Amino acid sequence: MENGVMMQYFEWNLPNDGMLWKRLKDDASHLHEIGISAVWIPPAYKGHEQADEGYGTYDLYDLGEFDQKGTIRTKYGTKQELQEMIEELHRNQIGVYLDAVMNHKAGADYTEKFMAREVNPDQRTEQLGEPYEIEGWTGFNFPGRGNKYSDFKWHWYHFSGIDCDVVTGKK
């Protein structure tokens, strides 16, 4: 088996212009000519806002297809553009690796009240004090997507930790 060459085709400060998928599609033949055999692309799913790089994950099933969080496209483009880019890369014998963060959630649709217990910030397995009621951004119902692809909705009981109590601001 021949050793391949993979290129990371993104960096943190890309413009929020929705053009990355188009640029990569247009660059596919050039990448093939210079010996690139695979590209690593940023998270393709909807973040908590359009400018999100994909690490503030809102909806893993929305690749730029649904009107959610004030936008249809992601920072990088639409689902259609993503599919066309992948097809063009494959035509040029270039593999595609997606960066994905499956355990991040951001931009919940609503808050929920639930019992929580404070933990030691230096040793998160050490619980401090008794459980008490807090309110957190933990409700995700994906109104723009509805139940397409999945009917799963996130609630407080799906999380093992949150950032803060929205009522008190305590972290």
Question: Can you say where each PLM-predicted feature lies in the sequence?
Answer:
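Substrate-binding/active-site clefts of carbohydrate-active enzymes
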Residues: N3-D26, E33-S37, P42-K171
